[in-house]
């Protein structure tokens, strides 16, 4: 039978199972509650401060596509924004970010969250290598550079990549303060 408009199957939206609960699998260590996420995050633990657990546990939390825990019960509310709303007891402006200090999207403890402007949040990006802000110019010649407010701050003629990474870290700390995301340097 050839599909026609009338007998063609309709697209359906898959919703997470409503029978699951995050409260089925959780544990507490040192005033931090670790709980399993549902859906694609099954087996992944998110964590919150113990004082927020009674409220957080009322909702189902899933691992969103972006890697953040989300609740569809709250209209795709991300857990870190939900927690911070509880901390400040009010609404967070849409143009303000809730930043994970340690860059771990699953760590939603009170002490790991802070408010940040979009610019401050961009300062705090993590790196996958020791080369953030470092560029090789030629053999044994590197430069360290940081951009803030459209102005490039740079130091050239640095003999090693490691030294350039250290100099970048110092410049970033001076310019961005607590929002600086330094290179990881092995000593």
UniProtKB/Swiss-Prot annotation:
Transmembrane annotation, as ranges: none
GO molecular function: endonuclease activity
Keyword list, A-Z: Endonuclease, Hydrolase, Nuclease
Pfam families: HNH_3
E.C. designation(s): 3.1.-.-
Protein's name in the database: Uncharacterized HNH endonuclease L560
Annotated source species: Acanthamoeba polyphaga mimivirus (APMV)
């Amino acid at each position: 039978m050839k599909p026609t408009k009338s007998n063609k199957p309709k697209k359906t939206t898959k919703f997470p199972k409503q029978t699951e609960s995050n409260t089925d699998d959780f544990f507490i260590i040192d005033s931090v509650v670790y709980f399993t996420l549902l859906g694609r995050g099954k087996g992944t633990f998110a964590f919150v401060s113990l004082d927020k657990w009674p409220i957080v546990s009322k909702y189902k939390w899933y691992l969103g596509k972006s890697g953040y825990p989300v609740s569809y019960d709250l209209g795709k509310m991300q857990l870190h924004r939900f927690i911070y709303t509880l901390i400040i007891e009010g609404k967070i402006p849409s143009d303000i970010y809730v930043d994970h200090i340690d860059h771990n999207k699953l760590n939603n403890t009170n002490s790991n969250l802070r408010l940040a402007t979009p610019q401050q949040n961009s300062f705090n990006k993590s790196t996958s290598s020791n080369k953030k802000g470092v560029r090789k110019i030629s053999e044994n010649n590197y430069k360290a550079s940081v951009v803030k407010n459209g102005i490039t701050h740079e130091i050239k003629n640095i003999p090693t990549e490691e030294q350039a990474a250290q100099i970048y870290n110092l410049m970033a700390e001076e310019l961005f303060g607590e929002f600086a995301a330094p290179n990881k340097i092995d000593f």
